[in-house]
Amino acid sequence: MSLRPIETAIASLTMLMLQGCAHAGKLDEKVPYPQPADGYQRNVIHLPMLADEENTKLELQVGKTMQVDCNHHSFGATVVEHTVKGWGYPYYEVNSIGGPISTRMACPSGTETSKFVAAHGNGFVVRYNSKLPVVVYIPQGFELRYRTWQPVQEFQTVPQD
């Protein structure tokens, strides 16, 4: 099934509007999510229900706003999925944050700006599930951001050589 351009545009706009509907919130007191370890903070995202959640992914982005020059800056990190024992609910921990690292281009003096510097690594794309909160533990001093991903068209066949 192929979507017409207008249907693709409507689906894309709907996803953009729904992204703004997710909100941070409190956890259900009955579910024993662990307390944050020393030096970590717990973040909770409540996602809106979607008609096609099995084809939607959630991309997590962890970073901090820093004064940077014209080079490309980033942190290295890994997202590890854990499970609340006895409940089977997932939660995520960002660990092994290293850096920041940057390219080494010569920058004109006075070009520093304030920018969000994100961490890159494995595990940052997770399952979209509006039935459970998305619980993410990140190091203190860092910020959690997210966005959703959804396919805009069917797979295309690659012809054989």
Swiss-Prot record:
Pfam families: Ecotin. GO terms for molecular function: serine-type endopeptidase inhibitor activity. Keywords: Signal. Belongs to the protease inhibitor I11 (ecotin) family. SUPFAM superfamilies: Ecotin, trypsin inhibitor. Residues 1-24 form the signal peptide. It comes from the Bacteria. This is Putative ecotin-like protein. The keyword Signal applies.
